[in-house]
Amino acid sequence: MFIKYLLIIVFSLPSISLTIIDVRTEAEWKSGYLDGAIHIEWQDILQLSSKISKDEEIYLYCKSGNRSGKATKILTDAGYLNAKNAGSIKQAGKLLNKEIINN
């Protein structure tokens, strides 16, 4: 009985919009990326302003977490308060439960 009510609660929750962004170079992206991620190099991150709501949950990753940290700062300074640095591609994969897609 408890499980039935738990499922009702879970399925009644509003869906959360989530965007995963790979901020590495084009060559790094082509070597593999997280399933469901979009690619935009960190220095071009503000191009998102017309495409993604400032309320959306955004996770950014790169090779080590450095560039994604810079991109996260740019976004938070621009009002994207739900932007989060997910670290390296491996860390982000674990955090978000996403596989790396290799081309």
Predicted feature descriptions by range:
Residues 1-8:
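Sec-dependent signal peptide recognition
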Residues 2, 18-19, 25-57, 66-103:
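Rhodanese-like catalytic fold shared by cysteine-dependent sulfurtransferases
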Residues 12-15:
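N-terminal signal peptide c-region/cleavage motif recognized by signal peptidases
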Residues 61:
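Short, surface-exposed ligand- or partner-binding patches at beta-edge/loop junctions that are enriched
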